[in-house]
Amino acid sequence: MTARHVVFSHGKESGPWGRKISSLAEVARSEGYEAHSVDYRGIEDPRQRVARLVEFCKELAGDLVLVGSSLGGYVAVASASLLHARGIFLMAPALYLPGLPELRESVLDCPATVVHGWRDDVVPFEHSVRFAQAYHSALHLLESDHNLHNQIRVIQYLFEYFLIALDLPALAFE
């Protein structure tokens, strides 16, 4: 059987095994994935974070699912095609923000699910709407703020569905 990996990318102000990542890692393991989290602390430049993720994933053989929160969402999107990711799951992704390098127009070639809080005052939820429209991604807008901590249980269910759907025929994401 092919090895299956979920690789988490945390946000700018958090760490590799924060509350959201730890809770989603449990879901990943229950679905037969190995869970990994890249430590970006001390790396401010998004391009360096992308390079760090690509380097980390070179050591992993098998199917790869990327999960990113905030700036980690940007890193996951920017890396997905380079790593031939099977899918990406994004939480309040820092997309289309001033100061971040622009993403290539056809950057994504795998299924994506985006979760964002209506009350996010760090990254406007409209940025996730724009991304979901551009890439025909599933989008879940929740009653929450940027950290989404009050919705972790819901996000766990959404992530579980996302992982299960990856094993279904392409219809699951159409």
Sequence positions of predicted segments:
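A conserved short beta-strand
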Residues: H84-Y96
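Acidic catalytic loop of the alpha/beta-hydrolase fold
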Residues: S14-G15, L97, W118-V123, H146-N147
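Conserved loop-alpha-helix segment in the C-terminal half of the alpha/beta-hydrolase fold
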Residues: W118-S137
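Post-His helix in hydrolase/transferase enzymes
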Residues: S22, E126-H127, H149-A165
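Short, surface-exposed "cap/lid" segments of acyl-processing enzymes
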Residues: M1-E44
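Short beta-strand/loop motif that positions the catalytic acidic residue
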Residues: V107-D109, V114-H116, D120
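Gly/Ala-rich beta-loop-alpha elbow adjacent to hydrolase catalytic centers
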Residues: V67-V77
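Catalytic histidine neighborhood in serine/cysteine hydrolases
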Residues: G32, Q133-N150
